[in-house]
Amino acid sequence: MSRFADWRVSAVPELRAILLAEKAEVPARTMRIADMSTNPDKQAVRAEALAKAAYERSLATTLGVGEMYWVSADMVGLALDAAGDVPGFNPATDLPASHGFMVLEQPLPALRTWVFDTDYQKRDVELEVDVIAWSTVGTGIRIESFCRNGRVPNAIDNGSFFEPVWYHTGVVDGLYEFDDEAAVELTVQLMSFLAAAALLMASPGVADRTTLAPKTKAARKDAKRGRSGNVTVISLHAPKHVPTGDADESGRVYTHRWMVRGHWRNQPHGPNRSQRSVRWIPSYIKGPAGKPLRETERVWAWRR
């Protein structure tokens, strides 16, 4: 299988196939790293490596039957912005599927993480995030992020296409509070983006969802194995325009239109409106029709 794939919607099944193939190689690669370790307790290192390899195989099995998503660049930007104040996150109820492979058209800002260098020693690096994958195994969930390996300086040349960036392993049916002071910052950043993306995907007034069935070799292989080769494409609705007069009540004259930023809201629903669900109130353009739109420069950054 080629370890070089185009970065486009139709290539998503191939990208997933590449990741699954690389996960299948984890046992041998993990053992090589264990053998090169300078840790004096070689037996413990090898036992840990074997356990990791077995877990990776179970993740690959579930990921292979999961849903595939392509998130457009504008939707990535909105989700990253919305992640800054997204409320708590329950993977069991908020994620669109139990297992998923999400490819981002535009990468997320770099996370401070580490890789093994050419001497098989850990080295701190900053890696962008191109892919997020999640797998539910029993009562637990594994959320992983990956960078295209071509962006990793001085990494081990193992022929892999993807480089792991960061991951989280925890309970699938539980509320994750992002404002918890004990939470790991990298985990908060990764999961808050995924939470925002998942909640926005479920908001029909915000996101457009279309289904593409790529006619590619990888998609045909998925079909032969009984897997769905369809890719859900998530893109952003154009913001609505809320017209106003040319002046406000005080007599101030408007010379431009402007963007009003979206925000999260707990909306009541259900019997006697006793239940609450998190909804994104989308951004909209306000001001007199026909006036120029005042553009503001935005810098996408991780939640702090």
Residues of each region from the PLM?
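Arg/Lys-rich, low-complexity, intrinsically disordered basic segments
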Residues: 210-304
